[in-house]
């Protein structure tokens, strides 16, 4: 069975996109929702080999990897995919020669899907583990590059206490990264200015990665924001 990429929703944000501080909490911010979603995707993969959605489309992976290659990030750099989902970003990183890869997710169903895909792709040396990033294990540390493509968006929809969840996320991020490490985030719920404010403690902006523009009512904007931060302390 050859893995195939889903043709549905690959360019869309999967987590209730709206660039506003006032977006409402949602079931999309719950573990139960993602467990159910990945159980369905796992069954679909077993049935027809469809890996499921590539969050924000395949270009969202390529723009991050282009930046990493332009910065001469070592192929041996320790890279963490936060909320790896189906693991396709890990697959793409491996295809580009990166060899020290870790993917985490709090959904066991997601990691079962990831495991199936990695086996099919013949990738044996990628580390995947169940982790709640808001309360990570002490062993999760020492990463040169951390990548988030939609996970912070989902966490921001937590119906219980999203403000605390955001703070815990930043704390966890600082704990797992090496000094001067890079954090690359792709978001459709937060603007550049909002992300700068959220990650101001301990991070500085290195680069805004180009994303597709849209025009509506004579106004030009971006539906997706992609930023590279560097840890400063």
UniProtKB/Swiss-Prot annotation:
EC class name: transferase
UniProt GO molecular function: methyltransferase activity; protein-lysine N-methyltransferase activity
Localisation: Cytoplasm; Nucleus
Pfam families: Methyltransf_31
GO CC annotation: cytoplasm; nucleus
Keyword NADP: no
InterPro entries: Efm4/METTL10, Methyltranfer_dom, SAM-dependent_MTases_sf
GO term, biological process aspect, one: peptidyl-lysine methylation
EC numbers on record: 2.1.1.-
Keywords: Cytoplasm, Methyltransferase, Nucleus, S-adenosyl-L-methionine, Transferase
Reactions it catalyzes: L-lysyl-[protein] + 3 S-adenosyl-L-methionine = N(6),N(6),N(6)-trimethyl-L-lysyl-[protein] + 3 S-adenosyl-L-homocysteine + 3 H(+)
Gene3D superfamilies: Vaccinia Virus protein VP39 (3.40.50.150)
CDD domains xrefs: AdoMet_MTases
Biological role stated in the UniProt entry: Protein-lysine methyltransferase that selectively catalyzes the trimethylation of EEF1A at 'Lys-318'.
Family note: Belongs to the class I-like SAM-binding methyltransferase superfamily. EFM4 family.
Name this protein carries in UniProt: EEF1A lysine methyltransferase 2
Protein species of origin: Danio rerio (Zebrafish)
């Amino acid at each position: 069975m050859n893995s195939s990429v889903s043709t549905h929703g690959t360019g869309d944000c999967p987590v209730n996109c709206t660039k506003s501080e006032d977006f409402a909490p949602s079931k999309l911010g719950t573990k139960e929702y993602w467990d159910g979603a990945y159980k369905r995707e796992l069954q679909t993969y077993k049935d027809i080999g469809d890996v499921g959605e590539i969050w924000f489309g395949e270009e969202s992976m390529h723009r991050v990897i282009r930046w990493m290659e332009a910065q001469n990030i070592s192929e041996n750099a320790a890279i963490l995919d936060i909320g790896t989902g189906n693991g396709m970003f890990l697959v793409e990183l491996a295809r580009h020669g990166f060899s020290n890869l870790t993917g985490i997710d709090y959904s066991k169903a997601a990691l079962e899907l990831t495991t199936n895909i990695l086996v099919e792709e013949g990738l044996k040396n990628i580390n995947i583990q169940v982790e709640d990033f808001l309360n990570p294990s002490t062993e999760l540390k020492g990463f040169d590059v951390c990548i988030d493509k939609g996970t912070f968006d989902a966490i921001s929809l937590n119906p219980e206490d999203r403000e605390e969840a955001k703070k815990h996320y930043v704390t966890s991020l600082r704990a797992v990264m090496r000094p001067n490490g890079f954090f690359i985030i792709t978001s459709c719920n937060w603007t550049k200015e909002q992300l700068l404010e959220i990650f101001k403690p301990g991070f500085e902006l290195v680069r805004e990665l180009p994303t597709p523009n849209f025009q509506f009512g004579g106004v030009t904007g971006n539906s997706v924001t992609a930023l590279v931060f560097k840890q400063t302390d």
